Amino acid sequence: MKQTSLALAITALLSTLPSALVQANEGCAPLTGKESGMDIGRSSTERCLPGANPLQDQQWYLLNSGQDGFSARGGIAGNDLNLWWAHRTGVLGQGVNVAVVDDGLAIAHPDLADNVRPGSKNVVTGSDDPTPTDPDTAHGTSVSGIIAAVDNAIGTKGIAPRAQLQGFNLLDDNSQQLQKDWLYALGDSNASRDNRVFNQSYGMSVVDPRSANSLDQSQLDRLFEQQTLKAQGAAYIKAAGNGFNKIAAGGYVLNRTGNGPKLPFENSNLDPSNSNFWNLVVSALNADGVRSSYSSVGSNIFLSATGGEYGTDTPAMVTTDLPGCDMGYNRTDDPSTNRLHGNSQLDASCDYNGVMNGTSSATPSTSGAMALLMSAYPDLSVRDLRDLLARSATRVDAKHQPVMVSYTSSTGKVRDVKGLEGWERNAAGMWFSPTYGFGLIDVNKALELAANHQPLPPLVQLPWQKINVTGSAAAIADVGNSPTSSTTRIATPLTVEAVQVMVSLDHQRLPDLLIELVSPAGTRSILLSPFNSLVGQSLDQQQLGFVRTKGLRDMRMLSNKFYGESAQGTWRLEVTDVANGTRQVSLLNRETRERTTLTERNNRQPGKLISWSLRVLGHDANRS
C-alpha cells in the first residue's frame, strides 16, 4: 500500500500548528506543499529559510549561500542538507523524540529549553538534570542545538526545531559508563524507550583489533534490533570517527608519517559498534562539499552529512554552547579566531559557538534530517526511511577518485591495486563511495520520494555462514602476486540491504593487509584499507602498555556497497599483503607532550587466513 501523498501529509501537519510557530523572514513565506512544478532542489529560485534567529544566516548546514560561519572564508553555496522546502511547508520534526547520548545537555539553555522533555538522566548524580558543571563539557549541548534548537528568534535554529530532546551524560568524565546505563539511555528503559532517534556522537579508536562478540556489544546489538524493528521504530545514528589523519589511544596521539598513499589511518570499520547493521554510520562533509579533513571513512558508511572544518580558516558549525562566558567552547578568554567567540556583540552571553565540528556534528545533522522525515511520515519503518535517504542522497565530489597502492611483489612484478574506492556504481545501479556512503543527505528529495514509496518487505537476516580455510589456500604471501581468496555460496533469493563479514587470521603486521569482498555480481568492496591504525603489534608493549596480538579474531566489518544487489550466488573474500618496507608512526604523549617515533618492521613470516563468516541482511527478492 502506498503512503499518503506528501501534500496531504504536509497539510495535516500544518493544520496542527499555530501560524506563529513558522517564523518567516520577509520574502520567505510558508508554502502548502501543493505548489505545482516547484523546483525543490539546491539551486531553486524559491530557496530561502524561514526564521528570524540572529545567527541563522551563518548556519550553512541549513542553507549554504557561501557564508563564512564567522571563519576566514565561506564555503561553496548549495552544500547543505537541502531542507528549506521542508521548513517552508511546516515539516519541523514535530512529534519526534530524540535522545542525545553524550556528555550532557544544558536543559535550561534559552535556545533548547522549550524542546527538552522530561526523562533525561544524569548517570553521575542519579538526577534528571544532565546539565554539565565542568566548563569543558559542552559537546552534547552543541550536538543538541544542531538537532533541535528552538525557532524562537533568539540565536540559532535546529534542523528539526520542533523535535523533543532528552539528554543522557554517559560521556561525562565522571561517568563510569556502566553497561546498565548505556542500555537505559539507548532504549531499554521506560524513560528512553519512546525516542525515535538515538544520537551517538562518539566512537572508539584502536591500535589492536576488537571483536564484536563481547557480551556488552551483543546486548546492545539485540536492543538496537528490537527497537529498530518495532512499529514506529527507532533510528540509531552513529559517528564514523575523526581519525582519517590521526587517532588518540592509550594516552597517545598517533599518526602515520611519510608520503604514502592518502588512505585513512582509522578505517571506520575498526570500531565494533560501527559494523552493527542497526547503526546508520555517517561521515562528515565540509562547507565546500568534500570530505571533512578529519572524517573517518569505510565500507560501513551509509551517508555523509554536514560536519564542517575548524571554524577558523573555514566554517565549522554554528550551534548552542554551555551558557556563560566562562563555560563551553566560547569563553571571554577564548583564543579562537572565530568571530563569534570571546564576548562578541552578536553573542554577548557566550551562549553559542562557531567551532563545533567532527562526525560528532554530522551525526546530529543526520538525526535532525531523520526527525524531519519521521515527522512527515510517522508510520514508515526505519528501514524505509534509510532506503529513502540512500536513494535521494546527492553524489557530491563527483570526481572523487580511488586511492591506488603500488607495490612490487615477491617475484618482482609491479602491482597496482585499489587501497580505497572512489565513486562506483553497483550492479543494482546504486552509487556508493566509502568516503561518502550513498552521498550527502537531501531532505527535500527524500520527502518527495516518500510520497510514492512502496514499503520494503520484511527484513530477512540470514544466519552467519562460516568458512574454515586450510592448507596452502590459507597462506597470505608477503607482497604476493595475487590475493588469498576463499568463497562461499548463498542459495537464498535475497535483495541485499547490508553484508557483514567476520575474519580470523594470523599476521605479524596487520596494516599491510587489504581485505575485500566480491559479490556474485562482481562488485568489489574494500572492507579494510591498508596502512591503517592497527599498529599495536609494533608498539613497545612494556613502555606504552599496549597488548600484542597475533592477528584478527572474528573481527566484524560491514559493507553497504552491495545495497539492492542479489545475494544469490558465490561470494569471495580476498586478502592481500601489499607492503614489505619499513614504515614509521609518530606518537605524542598527551600528558608530557613528548614525541617518539615507532618503526613498523615487516612481518618475518607469511600470514594465514584461518576462517571467515558471512551474513547478509535484506528482503525477499521475489517481493521487491
Swiss-Prot record:
Domain P/Homo B intervals: 456-622
Keywords carried by this UniProt record: Calcium, Disulfide bond, Hydrolase, Metal-binding, Periplasm, Protease, Secreted, Serine protease, Signal, Virulence
Broad class of where this protein is predominantly found: periplasm
Gene Ontology cellular-component terms listed: cytoplasm; endomembrane system; extracellular region; intracellular membrane-bounded organelle; membrane; periplasmic space
Protein's UniProt keywords contain Flavoprotein: no
Gene Ontology biological process: protein processing
Enzyme class: hydrolase
Stored InterPro entries: Galactose-bd-like_sf (IPR008979), Kexin/furin (IPR034182), P_dom (IPR002884), Peptidase_S8/S53_dom (IPR000209), Peptidase_S8/S53_dom_sf (IPR036852), Peptidase_S8_Asp-AS (IPR023827), Peptidase_S8_His-AS (IPR022398), Peptidase_S8_Ser-AS (IPR023828)
Domain called Peptidase S8: residue spans: 59-421
Residues the record lists as binding Ca(2+) 2: D321, L322, G324, M327, N330, C350
Subcellular location: Periplasm; Secreted
Note on how the cofactor is bound: Binds 3 calcium ions per subunit.
Observed phenotype of the null mutant: Disruption mutant releases negligible serine protease activity and does not affect plasma clotting.
Disulfide bond entries: C28-C48, C325-C350
The reaction(s) this protein catalyses: Cleavage of -Lys-Lys-|-Xaa and -Lys-Arg-|-Xaa bonds
Regulation affecting activity: Folding, maturation and production of the active form of the protease by the cell requires a protein (ORF2), encoded just downstream of asp, which acts as a chaperone. Formation of a complex with ORF2 in the periplasm also inactivates the protease activity and likely protects ASP from intrinsic proteases. In vitro, protease activity is inhibited by human alpha-2-macroglobulin, suggesting that this inhibitor can impede ASP virulence activities in A.sobria infection sites. However, slow ASP inhibition by alpha-2-macroglobulin in plasma may indicate insufficient ASP control in vivo.
Binding residues for Ca(2+) 3: D478, D512, D577, A579, N602, N603
UniProt pH dependence: Optimum pH is 7.5.
Signal peptide: 1-24
Keyword Metal-binding applies: yes
Function: Exhibits serine protease activity. Preferentially cleaves the peptide bond following two basic residues, one of which is Lys, but does not recognize the bond following a single basic residue. Probable potent virulence factor that cleaves various host plasma proteins, including prekallikrein, prothrombin and fibrinogen. ASP induces vascular leakage and reduction in blood pressure by activating the host plasma kallikrein/kinin system.
Domain free text: Contains an N-terminal subtilisin domain and a C-terminal P-domain.
Subunit-structure text: Forms a complex with the chaperone ORF2 in the periplasm. After translocation of the ASP-ORF2 complex from the periplasm to the extracellular space, the complex is dissociated in a pH-dependent manner.
Protein name per UniProt: Aeromonas extracellular serine protease
